[in-house]
Amino acid sequence: MNWISNVVRPKIRSFLNRRDVPENLWVKCPETGQMVFHKDLEANQYVIPGSGFHMRMGPADRLKATFDDGAYEEVALPDVPIDPLKFRDERRYIDRLKDARAKTGAQDAVKVAHGLLEGLPVTVAVQDFGFMGGSLGMAAGEAVVTGLFTAAEKKTPFIMFAASGGARMQEGILSLMQMPRTTVAIQELREARLPYIVVLTNPTTGGVTASYAMLGDVQIAEPGALIGFAGPRVIEQTIREKLPDGFQRSEYLFEHGMIDMVVHRHQMRETLARVCRLMMKAPGVPPKGRLPAPAAA
């Protein structure tokens, strides 16, 4: 061995060694194929800069983008029985839960928080499609109910960001039971004369659409979101007909009177604040740089 083998060879070996590169450094737009650096996408609230396509947004980013200065207090959620049916298909349900929790760092599909939206106290729940497709089970149902009761107790509007493939089949009737439970909790919020605002994101389907996702006093949707009960392919196979272009997309639902507005994610916070203030009869916030008009003598 000489200095060449001691110095040159190790350098060549280290140069040729494959470096581990994270898989999510670049994100591809599903519509145009445009590649976007992940930090640029995060800074743009997960909206593709060129096409305007709205990618899925996790609960932490959603809450940060909604509350003033990104500051909020998470609402503690009650524990629920885990896998009471001892369900198993290709894998045990308990194993699927463990994988989802390890992947997302969350206990289940819904996170609830309380904070300020342009100075107005609000309670917000966010459904995470990344956790088993945002499916509605006992834990998610309990989280929505807890959020509604928290809003009623604190006398705040309740904002629900919905994203789900439907009821969680591994929990059977216990999952379906969450549909009437959440509906009853919404009615209690209404009896307290407090606003319930729903933001439908891509996708919102199944039992979630058939319950709390379509019961808002104001129904808002993000652009291009898939919203419906059964998916378009299932409907086409059932009725044996071709569906209209854009069927079940947020723009189609708006044109046919199923939702109140379609709002770009960059305008969502401002829109939610305006709707909450209007429904709570709270004083408006003057535009930045402009002082409120003096009170009449």
UniProtKB/Swiss-Prot annotation:
PANTHER family: ACETYL-COENZYME A CARBOXYLASE CARBOXYL TRANSFERASE SUBUNIT BETA, CHLOROPLASTIC. It catalyses: N(6)-carboxybiotinyl-L-lysyl-[protein] + acetyl-CoA = N(6)-biotinyl-L-lysyl-[protein] + malonyl-CoA. This is Acetyl-coenzyme A carboxylase carboxyl transferase subunit beta. GO terms for biological process: fatty acid biosynthetic process; malonyl-CoA biosynthetic process. Pathway: Lipid metabolism; malonyl-CoA biosynthesis; malonyl-CoA from acetyl-CoA: step 1/1. One of its GO terms (cellular component) is acetate CoA-transferase complex. The gene is accD. Belongs to the AccD/PCCB family. It comes from Azorhizobium caulinodans (strain ATCC 43989 / DSM 5975 / JCM 20966 / LMG 6465 / NBRC 14845 / NCIMB 13405 / ORS 571). It is an enzyme of class 2 (transferase). Its main location: cytoplasm. Component of the acetyl coenzyme A carboxylase (ACC) complex. Biotin carboxylase (BC) catalyzes the carboxylation of biotin on its carrier protein (BCCP) and then the CO(2) group is transferred by the transcarboxylase to acetyl-CoA to form malonyl-CoA. The keyword Nucleotide-binding applies. Acetyl-CoA carboxylase is a heterohexamer composed of biotin carboxyl carrier protein (AccB), biotin carboxylase (AccC) and two subunits each of ACCase subunit alpha (AccA) and ACCase subunit beta (AccD).
